[in-house]
Amino acid sequence: MKEHKEVSALLQQAKQERRCCYGTSDAQRRALKRRLHAGELVSPYKNLYADRTLWNTMTREQQSLQVIRALSAIHPQWVFAGLSAACVYGLQHNYSLHDGTVHIASKSGIGGGDEARLNRIYINRIPTRKHNGILLTTPARTLLDCAAFPFPQALPIYDSALRKSLTTIEEVQSLMIQSVCDEVSVTKLLKYADPLSENGGESLMRGQITELSFGIPLLQ
């Protein structure tokens, strides 16, 4: 396909900024769609694009971060939440949790014009923190929302947050009491969360063992 210099420049800038590419004019958007239809690009989210070859070399987490960075640039007021926030904080988790969905905090329900891959997590009062230039729910609030995952999948996220000293058990407990969340799941996760867990694989295994009611491995 004939090179479109503006689009090539957009793709190069996006690569440098480790995010997906997007057009800012109708001409750029049309040119990007032509490359998409030609098979040169992929579109993981509406109006966002990435080089197909480069995209296929990335892990699911890296792909999610590329989308999040682009959406943060387009919608700087968005507060990313749940698994999306966990990714930006660098919390360890199983990549199988990624299904292309982007999670944001919202004081309102689902918008009629929302992209199918956008999930709004209702939060009446949204506690925020900026991390790497991206607006996120605080680590404590992020853990509350990640309690929605199955226990073995959520435990690595909790362990990682405590290991990184992003929050404390007491802070999460305090916020839990003030928030609408799954208190049973959060309480169980806080009971078994351990900052001494060295990596996500170890945390996942410990979570699976706990679920099967075997003895809890002693971490040193």
PLM regions and their residue ranges:
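Active-site metal-binding core of divalent-cation-utilizing nuclease and nuclease-like domains
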Residues: F214-Q220
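Conserved hydrophobic/aromatic pocket- or pore-lining residues that grip, position, or stack substrates
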Residues: I209
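Residue-level signal for short amphipathic helical patches enriched in basic/charged
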Residues: F149, L196, L212
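A short, highly charged nucleic-acid-interacting micro-segment common to nuclease
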Residues: S72-I74, K188-L204
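Short gly/ser-rich loop at a beta-strand->alpha-helix junction or flexible surface loop bordering the NTP-binding
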Residues: M1-D182, R206, L218
